[in-house]
């Protein structure tokens, strides 16, 4: 181990209680990564990457934003620079990311996957590139073996309703001991004002075998795909929305709006909101029928830089936190479902930290005793997926609800090297509790608090999702 490393056995663990909680109750728990954006083909085909850049930097908009901020030319971020030059420019950036979670993640990932404890910087970059690429090129670092290294029991990718789930099927009977599931992400069927909506419906119709001419046809097509996903092991849905849509509507209004859209006539913003509300209610009622968990990621302000969006497209690092009002529409939406006894298990993630207490109290309105932790306040997401953000989420949930019922961490990542984020979360959780034991705010009952830690690390998710 390098003398200048700060990644050691007790990283982030500030006292003996935190150390005991982590090492005895959390560290060795398997990982259930119930939401990510991994490529299922790479898992099913046990892909071996050419070099560290392809598995670590390509597709990682967290790193891209940092590099651009430092003044790195786009050629070496997403452009036509060589893989090695992109890595060297990332290495140049890393020392300047101190106090950003990228600094911790980077060194945790180098340590856990490659047993490298040197700090990544311009001086160490050549050596680390050579060493990591040599390992990455071997079977021991195939995608399936990368998942085994971190004790991943299950990964749940995210797919559009039109997806064939070809690679989930291919992997279904594997002998690795790893399960791969999928989450149903139908946002393209909801957002009627988006460019290409009609073309998307044509594709959805082809895949589902339903000619989509009316709103009833759209419902039938979506139900067909839910049935297909369910038959292939899907147990979750996911929605990435600025806010929950909930407007009063009638069936005749929705039929008329849908007809207008299919005739390529202009839809007003008010009509779009009514339509989106109708589709969302229909989907959520159907999720309840199939016993799925629905997830809502709320509050992102996306594609802010029109110039770069035109060049690079979405999910390339031009998004930020929005300040949309969340409480009233979310309450009305959940209440409408609950009133008909059609509210399924639900996880709500907020991107704006100002909404932490809003979400932490909202979930209590609809936890009716039918299921343990039925409605969940999700872990710190995206810009909040860091030490301060996760601590604030844990504190809000503890103060307003029951942290003991929390289903814990997820990566929400596109990278096969991001799984140490589970370790990061577990260390933060154990340190938070250990600190309160030390101060006398919690009893020195390691068996009971250790059970709580093990539950949040693994057991609660295992029971909640029933993969």
Swiss-Prot record:
Keyword tags: Isomerase
Isomerase keyword on record: yes
InterPro entries associated with the record: Metal_Hydrolase (IPR032466), Uronate_isomerase (IPR003766)
EC number(s) from the headed UniProt entry: 5.3.1.12
Biological processes annotated in GO: D-galacturonate catabolic process; D-glucuronate catabolic process
Lineage top rank: taxon: Bacteria
Major enzyme class: isomerase
Pfam families linked: UxaC (PF02614)
Gene3D superfamilies: Metal-dependent hydrolases, uronate isomerase, domain 2, chain A
Keyword Isomerase among UniProt keywords: yes
Annotated pathway: Carbohydrate metabolism; pentose and glucuronate interconversion
Swiss-Prot/TrEMBL catalytic activity: D-glucuronate = D-fructuronate; aldehydo-D-galacturonate = keto-D-tagaturonate
Molecular function terms, GO-annotated: glucuronate isomerase activity
Family under the similarity heading: Belongs to the metallo-dependent hydrolases superfamily. Uronate isomerase family.
Record-given protein name: Uronate isomerase
């Amino acid at each position: 181990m390098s003398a200048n490393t700060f990644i050691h056995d007790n990283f982030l663990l500030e006292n003996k209680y935190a150390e005991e909680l982590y090492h005895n109750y959390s560290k060795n728990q398997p990982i259930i990564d119930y939401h990510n954006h991994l490529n299922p083909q790479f898992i099913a085909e046990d892909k071996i990457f050419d070099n560290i850049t392809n598995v670590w930097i390509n597709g990682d908009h967290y790193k891209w934003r940092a590099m651009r901020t430092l003044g790195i030319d786009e050629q070496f971020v997403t452009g036509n620079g060589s893989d090695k030059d992109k890595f060297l420019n990332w290495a140049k950036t890393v020392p300047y990311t101190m106090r950003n979670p990228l600094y911790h993640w980077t060194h945790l990932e180098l340590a856990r996957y490659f047993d490298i404890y040197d700090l990544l910087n311009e001086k160490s970059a050549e050596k680390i590139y050579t060493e990591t690429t040599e390992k990455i090129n071997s079977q021991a670092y195939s995608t399936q073996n990368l998942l085994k290294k971190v004790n991943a029991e299950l990964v749940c990718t995210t797919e559009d309703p039109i997806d064939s789930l070809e690679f989930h099927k291919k992997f279904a009977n594997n002998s690795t001991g790893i399960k791969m599931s999928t989450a149903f992400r139908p946002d393209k069927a909801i957002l009627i004002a988006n460019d290409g909506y009609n073309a998307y419906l044509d594709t959805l119709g082809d895949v589902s075998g339903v000619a989509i001419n009316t709103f009833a046809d759209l419902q039938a097509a979506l139900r067909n795909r839910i049935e297909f996903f369910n038959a292939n092991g899907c147990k979750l849905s996911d929605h990435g929305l600025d806010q929950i849509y909930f407007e009063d509507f009638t069936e005749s209004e929705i039929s008329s709006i849908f007809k207008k859209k299919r005739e390529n006539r202009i839809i007003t913003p008010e009509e779009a909101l009514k339509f989106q509300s109708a589709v969302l209610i229909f989907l959520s009622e159907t999720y309840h029928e199939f016993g799925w968990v629905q997830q809502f990621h709320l509050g992102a302000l996306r594609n802010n830089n029109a110039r770069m969006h035109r060049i690079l497209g979405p999910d390339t690092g031009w998004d930020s936190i929005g300040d949309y009002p969340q409480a009233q529409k979310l309450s009305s939406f959940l209440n409408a479902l609950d009133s008909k006894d059609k509210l399924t298990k639900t996880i709500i993630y907020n991107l704006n930290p100002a909404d932490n207490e809003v979400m932490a109290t909202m979930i209590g309105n609809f936890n009716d005793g039918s299921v343990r932790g039925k409605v969940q306040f999700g872990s710190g997401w995206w810009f909040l997926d860091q030490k301060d953000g996760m601590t604030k989420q844990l504190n809000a949930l503890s103060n307003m609800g029951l942290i003991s019922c929390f289903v814990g961490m997820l990566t929400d990542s596109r990278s096969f090297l991001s799984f140490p984020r589970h370790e990061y979360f577990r260390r933060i959780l154990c340190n938070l509790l250990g600190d309160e034991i030390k101060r006398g705010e919690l009893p020195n009952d390691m068996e009971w608090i250790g059970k709580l830690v093990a539950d949040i690390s693994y057991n609660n998710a295992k029971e909640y999702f029933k993969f």
